[in-house]
């Protein structure tokens, strides 16, 4: 076996282990009593500006659309700060979790609907001040349609709060050079460089007005996820260290947190 094949086998084993560790960590957060639902440990950190960067862009009188809301984690945090939230997702299971969790809101200002996001959005045009679209775009085939639909749903002067993965980190480039699938999730249809993201947004009527740092990309992510499922205190310190590294090395950010204005 050549050195290249050995290197590829080792790197492939790391990717496989990271994917399995992430799934296990999500289950352990519930099994260890940290959450009533199966959630990633990152969603159990405190509600600080860095953990939930988008909340500072949600105005008290805003009407918010959460596209790809999943289990409603972000929808419900926004609902505690704004006038009204609508969440849409294609998973009936996740929407069930969101509906159950919404019972804890101080007022019933969140609604959830099922939708095939590959086919558009079942909402009126010009209705929303803000659209949240977090960790979704990379899972969608028909991204131009979805972005056009998001643009249609916004009021004049509205904004989209977007997060997508960065494909240009050192770790991902190393995987790609070895001929391996380098995306951070097996279901991702695309990951972006900043230039690619800007071009896709511009094509669909958006521009980036501000970028927030995320966390430093690392091949140790699976181990870090498992730590989070067992000790949130240690996970918090590791996450803070990854944020410091991301600020120091912007090209190594695991993703892009972007505030996008409709043109």
Language model segments and positions:
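A short His-aromatic
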Residues: 135-139
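A short glycine-rich, Lys/Arg-flanked "PGG" loop and its adjoining helix->strand segment in the class I
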Residues: 144-156
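Conserved N-terminal segment of class I S-adenosyl-L-methionine
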Residues: 1-124, 130-134, 147, 213-214, ...
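Conserved Class I S-adenosyl-L-methionine
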Residues: 240-259
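Short, glycine-/aromatic-enriched active-site segment of Class I SAM-dependent methyltransferases
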Residues: 166-188
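Conserved catalytic loop of SAM-dependent methyltransferase domains
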Residues: 118, 207-235
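Conserved beta-strand signature within the Rossmann-like core of class I S-adenosyl-L-methionine
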Residues: 158-164
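Short alpha-helix
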Residues: 189-204
